[in-house]
């Protein structure tokens, strides 16, 4: 039989391992762990009390380390939520789009795009949302023009993915306009607002010249557009063509002009298209605005009428340029095949056209968490209604329900979202632009 001393030596590593194991267990959930183990600090056996004190000391010493562990656990949970959110045949994501209140459109659009971009599936989301928006639009005049999460998604997508494109197209135009002499930088056409010393006929020519500069730059840029832009335009065109064939190009124009180029022309400083601290004169701002009105009418394939009679003098210019704009909308809606390069040794390299994957940041997780938490009941009801509308067979319906139940459990594990100040919904700048300027 081993002596008492040798037994202590033998058990010492086991004792230390037990203390370490308990330290790790308690640190993983301090609140629950201490609730059941705190009484060990008052145990009759002094060795138990000593062991507990060592456990408590380890927890305090390793606090920072386990905070990192807790963050990792939360990130893992968020990633599982994102996987299910992006998966499940887009049903959860599309349900959120259906039930999202106006006050959540901004955050929901940002959260949706962040999630799908992190899995390289942004275009899958946009194509599904575009098709659904077209199906739910009762009038071709409203196609991609009403305030909805679909139009907001397109605007956020354009802003995130088109910064370099819009800069390369429009920045040279703004530079040239700024270099023109003062007499070529007056654009008012409304005779009741024309300043002293200004001539309406000269202003009309200035408007035509400036608008032509913007139009030529835009209409010659189809091949510069990001491939993802052209895929979105192609999806809009094909989706609209099935239901409103006469409106397919104007629908593409609603995206590429109303939600992309026109807001940048009206507010070039917000897109970094002019030098910092550059002051744009009132006359030049008016010129930018009138140019966008002309371009938008071209995109809509309509002439000016009784609503703004002073703009009717530009109808000949519109008539002469409608074909140019329509041709541009057709070109940008064509998705080119991947480029190929033949190497000297005969091997062929095909262009990688896979979408860019952008990892989510903590602010993206927080935004997604809040939007889902606030809308979970609505999403649940919509998911249940979808099962009924789709007339699923019992086996598929059960799998559908099981998947959403798993998603709900993951959300329950996340608990309440972090407290953040929810921004007031101000609407999209291009919505405001469109409403204010009757485009």
Q: Which residue stretches match the model-derived regions?
A:
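Extended alpha-helical scaffold/tether regions of large eukaryotic proteins
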Residues: 1-439
């Amino acid at each position: 039989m081993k002596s008492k001393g040798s037994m202590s030596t033998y058990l010492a590593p086991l004792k230390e391992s037990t203390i370490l194991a308990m330290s790790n267990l308690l640190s993983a959930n301090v609140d629950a762990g201490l609730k059941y183990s705190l009484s060990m600090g008052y145990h009759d056996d002094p060795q138990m009390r000593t062991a507990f004190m060592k456990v408590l000391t380890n927890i305090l010493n390793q606090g920072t380390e386990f905070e990192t562990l807790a963050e990792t656990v939360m990130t893992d949970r968020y990633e599982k939520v994102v996987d299910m959110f992006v998966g499940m045949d887009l049903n959860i994501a599309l349900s959120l789009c259906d039930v999202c209140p106006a006050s959540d459109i901004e955050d929901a659009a940002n959260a949706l795009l962040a999630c799908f971009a992190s899995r390289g599936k942004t275009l899958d989301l946009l194509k599904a949302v575009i098709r659904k928006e077209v199906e739910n639009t009762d009038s071709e005049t409203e196609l991609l023009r009403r305030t909805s999460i679909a139009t907001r998604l397109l605007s956020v997508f354009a802003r995130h993915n088109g910064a370099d494109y819009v800069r390369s197209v429009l920045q040279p135009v703004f530079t040239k306009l700024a270099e023109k002499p003062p007499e070529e930088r007056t654009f008012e056409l409304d005779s009741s607002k024309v300043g002293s010393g200004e001539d309406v006929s000269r202003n009309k020519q200035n408007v035509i010249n400036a608008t032509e500069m913007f139009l030529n730059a835009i209409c010659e840029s189809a091949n510069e557009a990001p491939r993802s832009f052209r895929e979105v335009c192609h999806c809009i065109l094909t989706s609209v063509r099935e239901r409103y064939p006469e409106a397919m190009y104007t629908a593409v124009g609603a995206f590429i002009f109303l939600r992309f180029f026109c807001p940048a022309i009206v507010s070039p400083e917000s897109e970094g298209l002019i030098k910092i601290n550059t002051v744009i004169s009132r006359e030049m701002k008016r010129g930018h605005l009138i140019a966008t009105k002309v371009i938008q009418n071209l995109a809509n394939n309509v002439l000016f009428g009784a609503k703004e009679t002073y703009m009717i003098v530009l109808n000949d210019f519109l008539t002469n340029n409608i074909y140019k704009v329509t041709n541009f909308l057709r070109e940008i809606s064509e998705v080119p095949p991947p480029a190929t390069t033949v190497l000297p040794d005969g091997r062929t390299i095909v262009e990688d056209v896979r979408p860019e994957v952008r990892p989510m940041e903590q602010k993206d997780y927080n935004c997604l968490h809040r939007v889902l938490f606030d809308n979970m009941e609505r999403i649940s009801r919509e998911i249940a209604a979808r099962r009924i509308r789709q007339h699923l067979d019992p086996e598929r319906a059960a799998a559908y329900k099981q998947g959403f139940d798993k998603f709900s459990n993951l959300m329950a594990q996340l608990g309440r979202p972090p407290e953040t100040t929810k921004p007031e919904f101000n609407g999209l700048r291009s919505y405001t632009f469109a409403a204010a300027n009757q485009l």
